[in-house]
């Protein structure tokens, strides 16, 4: 028996390994099985090169549990190790067998990852003791057993083993007993090893017999050694890709289409990326791309390897050229990664472009599922926008699709305002905003449907990209003020009458939670509705953006602001105005007379003060101005009360307000019930 210390630069490296080297303890199993697979592949390479003349035999890697003994064993029939190799590759932690091996077989080493390196020591994250029982493939080699309890001290002794290969026996630590459970190991093997290039067996298959599961003699192989991405695309059919997608994502809807990646210069990259059906909720779609290194699962956190918007895709990327840290769990940013990201982005945009050109109708049919992905890409990657602007689509409220250039050409003549700005009208809900859409269409305008999660941010982006272009929701104002065709015409209603109308309706507006409503009076034509509610495009857009972007919570806290616009040309509004003036004239006469008198007095007082220096104005004069201002305000409040008392009993005023609120989904609860009862009374 030989004893010694592992060649490490610190006396206690194992606590470091256990706590800090690997982010997830569970990946020890990936490292162990990966090492076994590597050793098996090396054995196969030696046989192919003629450096091993014996029987290759079954190269299956086997994982087994012994709950009674508290051990987990990973066995292979690979190249094994001699005592000298154990001393070099295991005891001297700074060396790795992969360097010697790759140097010898560098011209034929595409599928070789390595043998024992730091990955082996991940076993101590879950083990109180590790045994290696190994026998080299070399003629005359003896079996050797290496044991270590997690300290730098180790023991090497002779062992009994008939065939070449290695058994790694992990004596599972007391605080890691979950790794002695069959379901846990099965789950980890499915996660990390399901596409490894050498068969991996865990127990035996079972069959249902006599009312229970019974083990058969057939190995339970957990992996597919030739996953779809390793095959030549020309040999595959659509059903092959769909079937593989179902293997990866059993509960997902069928993908729209896919891209088979296959490049060997200037970097190695294979894989299949699927376009899923993305309706909403971007965050739920992320982390569906699985990253592999020579068919060994590394991570599904691929933000560092592909642009952010591509994380919405599903599928597999496999590359030995993506740099990993010692734990193989976190990506490092370097030139190769950037090249790979650029390549993938180009392949994705090329695929979308080709589908658009070859099958425009099919592309349009898929647009609702593709839209959020393409919009996200244009918002987050300038290079993707430059490509996508030629195939990204706009959809109008009639269900017709247009490219950016096509739609601009369509609306250019009719929707350019007097200042030369091209106005893109849009709706976020064509049912709720139906009347606004119809009003716009009556003037010959086209209205886009922008009801997706990222449509409004995309509109903001396009305003920056497209010269003199503005996107405005169709209910943000009356249509005459959204697309102003000529200078404002002379008002058809005198200022005092507009004020009377405004006050009548303002006094009867309901108090809404976190919302303010202002009344406006406009000449809109007899055929237009008597009253509509609009909301500022700017404030609504800022509030929408605040839900998607951090740092904009200020807008989210602000109350909603609406305009109740009265159409002074409509017969109902004229009727309210005429009725109001005839019913309030007597009460208003003395009030308005008093207001005029007080306003004239205030003007005289201010004119007198304007001739003096500030220090020459007496306190009495200041108080006189203040008292006169208060007197005017008191009279205006009386005037307001007169209008309020009139409006309170006017069912038409209340009905018009409620109709406008109802049209915008703002009439609810008791107010809605009151409206219904009033409507019935008016019908009688």
Name each model feature, range by range.
Residues 112, 130-153, 173-177, 183-684:
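GHKL/Bergerat-fold ATPase module in large chromosome/replication-associated machines
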